[in-house]
Amino acid sequence: MIWVLLAQYQIPISSISVEPKGGERSCRERERDALLSFKASIEDPSDVLSSWQTGQDCCRWRGVVCSNRTGHVVKLDLHNNFTIFNYDYNTDMINYKFRMLGGEIGPSLLAIEHLNYLNLSYNDFGHKRIPEFIGSFKNLKYLDLSYAGFGGSIPPQLGNLTKLLHLDLSFNSLESVDYVSWLPRLSSLKYLDMSEVNLSTTVDGVHALNMLPASLRVLYLFDCNLNATFSSLPLYSSNLTSLVRLNLGYNYFHGPIPDGLLRNMTSLKELGLQSNDLIGDIAELMKRLPPKIEELDLSTNNLTGSLPIRLEHMTSLRYLYLYNNSLNGHIPSGIGKLTNLRGLDLSFNNLLGIISENHFASLTRLEELYLSNNNNLTMVVDPNWIPPFKLKYVDLSSCNLGPHFPTWIRSQTDIIDLIMSNTGIVDRLPDWFWNVISSVEYLDLSLNQISRVLPSTLEFLSAAYEINLNSNQFHGGVPKLMMSLQVLDLSNNSITGTVPLSMCNQVQSLEILDLSHNRLSGQLPQCLTSRKSFRADHGDLTLIGSKLSIVSFSNNSLSGEFPLFFRSCQYLNFLDLSYNDFYGSLPIWIGKRLPQLAFLLLRSNMFSGYIPIQLAKLDYLHVLDLAHNNLSGTIAPSLVNFTAMTTVSSYGSYYVPDFISMLVVTKGQALEYYTNTIISLMSSLDLSSNCLTGKIPEEIGGLATLKNLNLSGNRLTGDIPETIGGLWSLESLDLSNNELYGEIPPTLSNLTFLSYLNLSYNNLSGVIPSGQQLQTFDDPSIYKGNNDLCGPPISKNCSGDGTTLNYPLKYEDGNEMSSFYLSMGLRFAVGLWVVIGPLLFKRTWSAAYFLFIDNIFDKIYVFMVLNWARLIANIRKK
């Protein structure tokens, strides 16, 4: 692969004089001893260097190449060759890490004086610095330390490698404060990749690009934190006229692309400026591109305008990536003349109009087509059209393809990824479909109205790792699954029957399972393996499906006790069994066996018994919804001690994909949350509509990051605890329909984010506290059914009835109280004048402002009169 890359980047292979092993000369003893000493300092868990044995010819060792002529070691290639990941990512990652070399790179290698090729990539050297002695290999022409876990500063001694042609330091944790001092000395360098090397600390680092060797043909500075205006780049005045490939993506460049940027780079074939903050017109930019550009990536910027008609003359283009900009207008049909085009990504723009056969007329080599999220883009082709291409990757989501299922897909037998979500298809899935996509790995037909009985088995899709058919009209039973599957979403369909026992043996790789909103019935399979497979001493049940992290069976008719199936799912972070017919008690093992659980949704079932206090051990629990069950007992103080609800930082390491939804009843309405970002910010405790008794524990005030608290519809008694004022993040509080008594605590006014409150139908008494956020609640119904409450916003007056009044601010005597109200009045007047004064000079502002004042004046007046009455009553009493 290295030789292919060198040829592609026009680096003469002959210039790197590595000779194949197999010659008659054996290696030099001094060099063999040096290699053995190197091996002794290296960590090699998978025994990659097992062939390196004392007394044997080192020229025949793995990764070692000697010169046929001299016997000197000239090449050392110890890169981790396990770099191809298939369907089981977790298993592959374990194998990949197991094959990594680590430890110390000892200076014994200096004995190999004739080394001209060194590759240590894809290993892990534990963030150690790159050894300075590497700069002593005077004959080195090829150095690859990418993805090797190095850290710290790049040693300037690398500047001594004056014969170096290829240098790759990418994707480590490196930084370079003074790369200006050593890079220009590499006068023969043709290939330089310093991607993800932090260059932000380099003094005048952007202008230092002018000092790069003129010999460079490939320059990759991807994600180097250069952070500058693009106009400050000196590339247009530099001597990098031989550049063939240039990537400056993810560098926080901003502003327009200057006219002369690419003036001298007439040989440029690849240009990557993706994920910056560039502005400008796409048509003007394309005028400046070199005539033989082959790969252009301007994605994730702020480019505007329409694609130019002259695009059809860029006949060398192989890959065009313009996604996630603000492009508009029509896609020119001349794009169909780009005969070399292999990849086209125009997704996430504002493109519109019709896509026809003409747009693809001569695209015989096209393999990647991404047009998603251009909501006004419609594809209209003849039903009998057979495309000239064989696509592998297709994403047309949120384009208009319907109402009929696109028949041209029938010819695309090489498809690996097929995404046609939300495309307006209202049709029956064709008979030929499953045969055509037999090689698919990722299938998404969600958010359409596609109908058909699901096949009894999907095992023939042996390569598939994700299938998403949610929100369609599929019916039939749950099909048998393939062993490779990681994500299955059949939610919002009409799937019937039971969850088959066969799933237990066919979900070994499954991580996300969503069968919610269907018509499933019966009990979930327990999926226990033989008793020999788990250890009774520790109770560690080994269950098939232990990789599951997200499971939703909500809105079905499933029954039975809490499924024992989940007992071994130690990575589970999202579990939704709500709106079913599950019964029995909640198992205490939830708190121990599911340590990663962040969302537990069991609403609207028939669970009974106590709420196990072991749930408090779930450190990452953000949402607990046990509403509408038959749970009884008290709310134990230890139960309201969820770590993730007490501190801002306890979010855990979980991911919920966008297509997984979560229903939360908050602010008096049921809200459905979809995206991972919103779900991860939600914190909710809902125990409503059960049979809970006793007091609300004072410890509940420690849940400082809780946003939604609903304890309504129980039989709770006692006071509302004063500590409730500690819920400073609370937005919704519902304590209605209980048997709470006593006064409403004035600390409730501390909840400055509170936007929904319901205390109705309790036995609360006394004055409704005012101040801060509570003054915004002017709907008397939130206090309805508490006959002994008085004060705004209800009509019952608190003054003159002989009742002992309690209110938020209490003082020793009337003089202090009078001073307080006098001070408050003066502050109010001064503050009001500071606001109103400027308004007197701006007529439109003053009109709007005083109209607002008129609306609230009555409320302020009533508030002041009421407090004055309280003052007089208190003075008389004393």
What do the PLM-derived regions correspond to, one by one?
Residues 1-878:
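Plant-biased, solvent-exposed loop and capping regions
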